Amino acid sequence: MKNQYRVLLYYKYVHIDNPEQFAEDHLKFCKDLGLKGRILVAGEGINGTVSGTVEQTDRYMSEMKSDPRFEDMVFKIDESEGHAFKKMHVRHRDELVTLRLEDDIDPNELTGKYLEPKEFYEAMQQEDTIVVDARNDYEYDLGHFRGAIRPDIKAFRELPEWIRDNKEKLEGKKILTYCTGGIRCEKFSGWLKKEGFEDVSQLHGGIVTYGKDPEVQGELWDGKCYVFDERISVPVNQKEHVIVGKDYFTGEPCERYVNCANPECNKQIICSEENEHRYLRGCTHECRVHPRNLYVKEHGLSEEEVQERLEKLKEEEHAAQS
């Protein structure tokens, strides 16, 4: 039967004593329940995505809410046809989201104004408003709010420097910020306020909540939302689907992410199935001929077959240029 599984996305900024021990105990608890997923635990709180059956996820939410620290924690729930992860990991970290600020931000003390989906939808359309995507470039490239700024960053910790370098774009504007589930914006919007930006708001519950809201139904979102599990992406806009992703090799509309087959590169690229085969899932010629190319290994290709494909590719590229 379809959709017997669920994926839970959640976070909570709350003080956790002895987070290392908590992480160890929590891993056992999750494994005993039969869950799979990835959970980060820090002194400042918890951030997780787990998958399991309806019964397993219900038990998990019930147990978590029975702990006074997590009794008001919001769980974002997605139906799924199976597990979204291969294993169960609970890891201790210094920070739930890595900003590495000299003076850390506690979102319970300083954060941007929370906007519910309808409020965010309306605010995006107002004058003197700038919408800043608080995610990484590869997340933006798969989908984003219409007109949102794409910070040129590969990791969240690079965002403060990018903001400082582009301060003139934001000064005197109303700033709206958003991320997948809301956790990055809790800190980022607080940091913006600390930097002197006065009018800062964040999408409460993130893109995931916006896409499920019965009123806005994901409107003004183009593309899909990147997620950090085996689903890779989830739909957001229930009214219209606009593909914004572009194939790495041809620039054609595409929403399929793969990792470069060279394990030393592992770059994420948007790529059609056809082009994955044509380019041996290598983002460059060097990656295609790499001795440890995983595509070659997975498909059991001989050296002769690899050479044949590379020659064909060379001919196609030569023909396209002439």
From Swiss-Prot:
It catalyses: uridine(34) in tRNA + AH2 + O2 = 5-hydroxyuridine(34) in tRNA + A + H2O. CDD domains: RHOD_YceA. Keywords: Oxidoreductase, tRNA processing. Its EC number is 1.14.-.-. The active site is at C179 (cysteine persulfide intermediate). It comes from the Bacteria. The keyword tRNA processing applies. The keyword tRNA processing applies. Signal peptide: none annotated. One of its GO terms (biological process) is tRNA modification. Residues 125-219 form the Rhodanese domain. One of its GO terms (molecular function) is oxidoreductase activity, acting on paired donors, with incorporation or reduction of molecular oxygen. Catalyzes oxygen-dependent 5-hydroxyuridine (ho5U) modification at position 34 in tRNAs. Belongs to the TrhO family. This is tRNA uridine(34) hydroxylase.
